[in-house]
Amino acid sequence: VWGLILVAAIVGPWAGAVTVATDGGFWTEAIGADLAPKLAGGQESHGAPPGYHLLLTPFLAFPMTLLLPAALIGAWRHRGEAGVRFALCWFLPTFLVFELSPTKLPHYPLPTYAALAWLAARAFAEPLSPTARYAGAGLGALVGLVLAVGCVYLAALFGDPNDVWAVTLAAGLFAGAGLLPAWFMARRAVGEATAAALGLGILAHGALAALVAPGLEPLKVSARLEAALETARLLPRQGVAEAPVAVAGYAEPSLVFALGTTTELHGAAEAAAAIVQGRPAIVEAAEAERFRAALAQDGVGVREVARVEGLNYSKGDPVSLGIYMAAGREDGR
C-alpha cells in the first residue's frame, strides 16, 4: 500500500499538470498515437522477435556483464529475501513487457538495468560459485572482444583513416575490459576482476565516445544538416531566414533538437509549401520527385544549396538530403 501511495505522490502532480496543460491531449497522443501502434506491431521499421533485448543485454550492460551470471544465480537462490524480491519484481515484468512488444529499440529496457546492478551487488555478499565465476568470465571476455571488433568495424566503414590510433586505443580497452577481469575471475579474485572491469570499461566507453564517435561523420546526419544550414544562413536561430524548416523523408528527433522544436517533419507537399512561403526545406532523395512536382504546380522555382549524405543508423538506411530554398535568393533573407 505504501508503495502505491509513494508512486501516486511522485507521479500524480506531474500527471495532473500535463493533463491540464494539454487539455488531455498528451494522453491521447502518447497512448493512442504512440504506445498503441507499438503494441500492435513493429512501428517505424523497429520490429524484432522476442529475445532481441535478452541478446543485447550483455552488450549494453558491459562491463557489468562479468557479474550477470552471478546476479541471476544469486537472485534465484535468495529469492525469498525482501530486497531480492523487490529487484526481481522491478526487472522481470518490465523487461518482459519490452521483450513481448512488437516494436523494439535497444534503449527501451535500460531502466531495468539498475535492478540487475542491485542483484549483482547482492552477489558480493557471499563467495561466487564456480559456475557463476566461469560463466561470468567467459561472457565478459566474449562481449569485450565483440565490442573491440565492433569499434574497428565501425571505423573501417565510417571513420577517418587518420583516427587509427583512437580506434586502436578504444578497441584495446574494450578487449582488456573483457579479458583481464576474466583472468582475475578464473583465479577467484572477484574483487580485482570487478575493479578491472569497471576501470577499463569506463576508459573504453570514454575513448569510444570522445575519440572514435566524433570521426564517424556519415552517422552524424543531423549535425551535418545543422552545419550546412548555418553555412547557408538558413538556420532558424540565426534569425536571417524564415522559420521553421520543413523536412520531408527524414523524421529523426536529433534533427528537431538541432533545428528547434518548431521544425516541421512532414512530407513532400509540406516541404514545397515551405518553399512557397519563403522558408527553407530539407528533402530526402526518395521524396525529391514529389517535392518538385508540387512546386511545379505552384509555379515556384527552387535551388539546392547543399546536400548531406550519410546513414540513418536508427533505421539502417542510407540517406541523401538536399537543402533547398526558393530560386533567385542568394541567402536566407
Where are these regions (language model features)?
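Transmembrane-lumen/periplasm boundary regions of multi-pass, lipid-linked membrane glycan transferases
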Residues: 1-107, 112-126, 131-167
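Extended hydrophobic-aromatic, low-complexity segments
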Residues: 106-109, 120-121, 130, 188-196, ...
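Alpha-helix capping/termination and helix-coil
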Residues: 115, 119, 128, 187-188, ...
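Active-site beta-alpha connecting loops in nucleotide-dependent enzymes
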Residues: 135-139, 169, 216-222
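Internal/C-terminal transmembrane anchor helices
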Residues: 144-146, 174-215
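Hydrophobic alpha-helical transmembrane segments
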Residues: 165-170, 195-197
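Short periplasmic/luminal acceptor-recognition loop of GT-C membrane glycosyltransferases, typified by
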Residues: 195-320
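Core SAM-dependent methyltransferase catalytic element
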Residues: 315-332
